[in-house]
A protein has these predicted regions:
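Predominantly five- to eight-bladed beta-propeller fold
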Residues: 13, 89-141, 146, 151
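Conserved beta-propeller blade repeats
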Residues: 30-48, 65, 72-90, 119-132, ...
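Beta-strand-rich domains and repeat architectures in extracellular enzymes and scaffolds
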Residues: 1-13, 166
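Conserved beta-strand and immediately adjacent loop positions that scaffold enzyme active sites
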Residues: 14-16, 54-56, 131-133, 167
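Multi-bladed beta-propeller domains
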Residues: 18-34, 58-74, 106-112, 136-164
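Generic domain-boundary/flexible-linker signal
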Residues: 8, 66, 79, 98-99, ...
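Feature marks short, surface-exposed loop/turn motifs that line or immediately flank catalytic pockets
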Residues: 3-5, 95, 153
Length: 167
């Protein structure tokens, strides 16, 4: 559920759990940032979600939130291996230099270098590619890096517009 703060002119999404037969809801999170992409670990023991650009787990009652990833610049999605030995996560990768990379003496430049027909998709500029990374999952250790299984490829997975990580 998203709550709006008029003074800050923004909304915050929190997670709830609903007992369908009884119709009872339990608020799981109450933070000043967004939680999204909720799911369950394959063993059914923990609720998983994205918050602050990272993967988190918590008990089904909302207690003991634990950050699973600590990936620089954050992640966009995730999937656990059925045996929970690995996690695949999505992360944006910059492959082409930006104007600021090429011209550091022009830090305020708002230019773009376009050398491909696919430079914009719907309402987004294409300035990075979403790649799949795979990492070992050890519950007590935050994941700080993974293997880019698409390294150097100028393709995305999943393909825009995102239809879900299962693509």
């Amino acid at each position: 559920i998203t709550y709006f703060n008029k003074e800050e002119d923004r909304g915050y999404s929190d997670l709830y759990l609903m007992n369908l037969p009884e119709g009872q809801t339990t608020r799981l999170t109450d933070t000043d940032y967004n939680e999204s992409d909720a799911g369950w670990t394959p063993d059914g023991k923990f609720i998983t979600y994205l918050a602050k650009g990272q993967l988190w787990e918590m008990n089904p009652d909302g207690s003991n939130p634990r950050q699973v990833t600590d990936i620089p610049d954050g992640i966009n999605g995730y999937v656990y291996a059925p045996d929970m030995s690995k996690i695949v996560y999505l992360k944006d990768v910059q492959l082409e230099p930006t104007v600021q990379d090429l011209y550091p003496d022009l830090p305020k430049a708002k230019a773009r270098i376009v050398d491909d027909q696919f430079y914009r998709h719907w309402n987004d500029w294409v300035d990075a590619y979403t790649h799949l990374f795979i990492a070992d999952y050890v519950p007590a250790q935050p994941i700080t890096t993974g293997k880019d299984i698409m390294e150097g490829e100028r393709w995305e997975s999943p393909v825009r517009p995102w239809g879900g990580v299962e693509q």
